[in-house]
From Swiss-Prot:
Highest taxon, organism lineage: Eukaryota
Similarity remark: Belongs to the UPF0415 family.
Protein name: UPF0415 protein C7orf25 homolog
PANTHER family, alphabetized: UNCHARACTERIZED DUF1308, UPF0415 PROTEIN C7ORF25
InterPro entries, sorted: DUF1308, DUF5614
C-alpha cells in the first residue's frame, strides 16, 4: 500500500471512529464519562492526518503506521463489546508499592465499574520483545503494566470487591505473556500466538542471556532466544459474554430511602397537585417513573440494615409528618430491617463537615461501609461532596419521595387533561 492510499485509509478510519465514539458517548443515560475526551483525541488525530494530506506536515510511512488511531480504535471496539460502560480513558490515582502517588489510565470501565479493560493495539512481537528487555529505554512491559493495574484496582473497590481486569489484545499476544497474565489473575482477550525457539545462540550465550536478564520467570534463557510466530494462532479468546460479578448481598438504608419506601407518592398517591411545589414535582416524577419497583428490585434477596440514628430520625419524622398508611408501612418495613449501632468507618470520620456533610450522614454512610453494605439513598449531595474529599461510598442512588399522605387533604386532584411543565 502506498503512503497516499494508506493516508486516505487512515483518514477514513478516523472519521468512522469519531462517529462510533459519539454513538458510544450517547449509549448511556447521562452519557459515558470520558466520551468527550475520546472524541477530542480522535478529532486531533484526524486534523493531523488532514494536515499531512494537504502537505502542511511531512511524515514517514512508519510514523503513519504508528499513529494513536490503532489504540483509540481498540478502546472503542472494547467498549462496544461490553455491557454497562460507565467511562472511557478514566484516570485512577493510587499508591504504588513504595507508597508513592501514581495515576493509571483505564481504557474502558464497564459492568457498572466492576470491569477494567486495557486495550492494546501494538503487535505481539513488539510486546514480547519489550518483555524480554529488547525494547527502547523506558518502555514498560505489559507484565509491569499488569502489576500497576492490580495495585490500583485493589485500592478502588466497587461494592467492596476489586474490579476484574481484562487485557484486550488487538494485534495478538505471545503465549508465554498470556499465560503469565492469567497466572496474575488477569483475563486475556485476543489471538494468542505461538513462540518459536531460535537455535542461533550457543548454550553459553543462552546462559549469559538468562543471567543478565531481569525478566519474569525461571525460563528466561529460553524466552531470550525465542521469536513470536504471528501466523501460528494457538487460541482466540473473545470478550466473555457474561462477566460474573460478586454481588454485595448487604444493603444499608438511609433515612431518605426509608421515607421514599413508605411514602404515599410511591404507593399510588401521585395524582395530586400539592400546595408545595417540591411535592408536586415529586408526584410528576413518580407518574413518569415509579420508584418502588426499582427499590424492591435492588433490595430483593439481600439482607437489610439500618443504623440506630437513621431509624430514630426516620421515626421522629414519621411521627410529625406521616399519615396513617405511611406509618403502617413503616412498621412493616422496620420489622424487615436489622437495626445496628452507629459504627462509622475511619474514612467516613475523616470527612470535613460542610453544608452537604453532617454528622448524621457520616454515621449512616460510614456504618454502611463498616458493614460492607451498599447504602441506598436519595442524598446524592452528600455522595458527591464526600467524593470531592476523596471518599467514595458504595451507593445505590434513587429519586426522593416525601411523606405526602397528610398533605392530600389540602391538595388538588390532578385533572384528566393536566400537563406538567416538564411535559411541555
Amino acid at each position: 500500500m502506498s503512503v497516499d492510499s494508506m493516508l486516505c485509509d487512515r483518514i477514513d478510519i478516523a472519521k468512522q471512529l469519531i462517529k462510533r465514539a459519539e454513538a458510544l458517548s450517547r449509549s448511556r443515560v447521562g452519557g459515558v464519562e470520558g466520551g468527550a475526551k475520546l472524541c477530542s483525541k480522535l478529532r486531533a488525530e484526524l486534523k493531523f492526518l488532514q494536515k499531512v494530506e494537504t502537505g502542511k506536515v511531512a511524515i514517514k510511512e512508519s510514523h503513519l503506521r504508528s499513529t494513536n488511531l490503532t489504540h483509540l480504535q481498540a478502546v472503542i471496539e472494547s467498549a462496544e463489546s461490553l455491557e454497562e460502560v460507565v467511562s472511557v480513558l478514566h484516570v485512577f490515582c493510587y499508591n504504588d508499592q513504595f507508597g508513592e502517588k501514581q495515576s493509571l489510565v483505564v481504557d474502558v470501565v464497564a459492568n457498572s465499574g466492576h470491569t477494567w479493560v486495557k486495550a492494546i493495539g501494538r503487535k505481539a512481537e513488539a510486546l514480547h520483545n519489550i518483555w524480554l528487555g529488547r525494547g527502547q529505554y523506558g518502555d514498560k512491559s505489559i507484565i509491569e503494566q499488569a502489576e500497576d493495574f492490580l495495585q490500583a484496582s485493589s485500592q478502588q473497590p466497587v461494592q467492596y470487591s476489586s474490579p476484574h481486569i481484562i487485557f484486550a489484545f488487538y494485534n495478538s499476544v505471545s503465549k508465554p505473556m498470556a499465560e503469565k497474565l492469567k497466572e496474575m489473575g488477569i483475563s486475556v482477550r485476543g489471538d494468542i500466538v505461538a513462540v518459536n525457539v531460535s537455535q542461533e545462540n550457543s548454550p553459553e550465550e543462552n546462559y549469559l542471556s538468562g543471567s543478565e536478564s531481569d525478566c519474569d520467570g525461571d525460563d528466561t534463557s529460553v524466552l531470550h532466544v525465542s521469536k513470536v510466530d504471528s501466523e501460528n494462532i494457538v487460541a482466540s479468546i473473545a470478550f466473555p459474554t457474561e462477566i460474573k460479578v460478586e454481588v454485595c448481598k448487604r444493603v444499608n438504608l438511609d433515612i431518605t430511602t426509608l421515607i421514599t419506601y413508605v411514602s404515599a407518592l410511591s404507593h399510588g398517591g401521585c395524582e395530586w397537585i400539592f400546595k408545595e411545589k417540591v411535592l408536586t414535582e415529586q408526584a410528576a416524577q413518580e407518574r413518569q417513573e415509579k420508584v418502588l419497583p426499582l427499590l424492591n428490585s435492588f433490595m430483593e434477596a439481600k439482607e437489610l440494615f439500618a443504623c440506630e440514628c437513621a431509624v430514630k430520625d426516620f421515626q421522629s419524622i414519621l411521627e410529625t409528618l406521616g399519615g396513617p398508611a405511611e406509618k403502617e408501612r413503616a412498621a412493616s418495613l422496620v420489622k424487615r430491617i436489622t437495626v445496628v449501632p452507629d459504627q462509622p468507618s475511619e474514612r467516613a470520620l475523616q470527612l470535613a463537615s460542610s453544608s452537604k456533610i453532617n454528622s448524621r450522614s457520616i454515621s449512616i454512610f460510614g456504618t454502611g461501609e463498616s458493614l460492607k453494605a451498599i447504602t441506598m439513598t436519595a442524598n446524592s449531595g452528600f455522595v458527591r461532596a464526600a467524593a470531592n474529599q476523596g471518599v467514595k461510598f458504595s451507593v445505590f442512588i434513587h429519586q426522593p419521595r416525601a411523606l405526602t399522605e397528610s398533605k392530600e387533604s389540602s391538595a388538588t386532584p390532578l385533572p384528566n387533561n393536566y400537563i406538567s411543565s416538564n411535559q411541555l
